[in-house]
Amino acid sequence: MTDIMETRPPDSPSPELLEFLLPLHRSFEPRRRLLLEARLRSLREAEAGRLPGYLSGSEATDGTWRLSVPDWAQDQRNQITGPADNAKLLVAMCNTKDPGCMPDGEDSITCDWPNVRAAHRNTIAAIQGTLTFTDAAGKTAKIVPGKQVMFYRPRGLHLDEMNARPGETVSGSLFDLAAVFFGTAAERRAAVK
């Protein structure tokens, strides 16, 4: 009998992706756990009638906080979002005239292993401009090159991923981000040249 903890799920991450992910996981997991514990404490306090407020003296409340948005992300008046695991919808989203596109890896999909990995593959292929979809009639749709900015939305901080590495749970959000970031490294390098 095979120990289930040693069984690799289908579509397992490559050793290279794991080599990229695991140092990030080990670095950020303690902080993530602290944030999740703080979130639970805040929830308990809110349930007891003590609602949260802003930190006094915070730059966010005194009007001095500013964020510089790069030129390529300035025009975000209209952004389209949808499920990253659905190639047909993602191709359609990428082919709109909207300045922004957000493949959603959490709320728009069921976060089981096949859907999560499909979301990774589709998002990577969309960024690379190679994502296609062929319907039942044999008609193929592909991404038309454009200037649309893509913002991938990973799963939330509170969601774990148990299939990335046998016997070890990692942050779902960090795994999603690492998979897409790692899978599009060549495109990002080319963009800065």
Segment roles from a protein language model:
Residues 2-27, 34, 49-65, 70, ...:
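Conserved alpha/beta-domain cores
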Residues 76-78:
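Short, contiguous strand/loop micro-motifs
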Residues 98-99, 119:
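Long alpha-helical scaffolds
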